């Protein structure tokens, strides 16, 4: 990501990425339906719930807005605190 940000900076373009974790989507619906697996998995998350599409969308909207114009080359974990629990 940092290399992309360096290359794009000369064009006044910022580059960042979002590192997501388990998120409620149609593709994860059957996996999330297993209560025992969910309980074990969510015990590793500070927030204790899977992500929702809006959780990721809100970060993407921020990074696409003028509010983030001075941010580049960063990775943002949007994962319910999973990386804090490691």
Question: What are the language-model segments listed below?
Answer:
Residues 61, 72-86:
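Short C-terminal tail/terminal secondary-structure segment
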Residues 2, 14-16, 48-49:
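Short, cationic motifs built from Arg/Lys/His that form the positively charged side of catalytic pockets
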Residues 21, 48-49, 74:
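Glycine- and other small-residue-rich loops at beta-strand/loop junctions that grip anionic moieties
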Residues 9, 14, 71-73:
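Short, small/polar-rich loop/turn modules that mediate ligand/substrate recognition or access, typified
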Residues 45-56, 67:
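A conserved structural motif in NAD(P)-dependent oxidoreductases
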Residues 14-24, 64-67, 77-79:
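Conserved SDR Rossmann-fold cofactor-binding beta-strand/turn motif
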């Amino acid at each position: 990501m940092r290399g992309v940000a360096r290359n794009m900076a000369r064009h006044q373009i910022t580059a960042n990425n979002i590192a997501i974790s388990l998120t409620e989507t149609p593709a994860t619906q059957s996996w999330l339906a297993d209560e025992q697996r969910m309980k074990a998995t969510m015990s590793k998350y500070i927030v204790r719930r899977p992500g929702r599409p809006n959780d990721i969308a809100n970060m993407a909207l921020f990074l696409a807005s003028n509010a983030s114009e001075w941010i580049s080359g960063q990775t943002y974990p949007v994962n319910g605190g999973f990386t804090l629990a490691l």
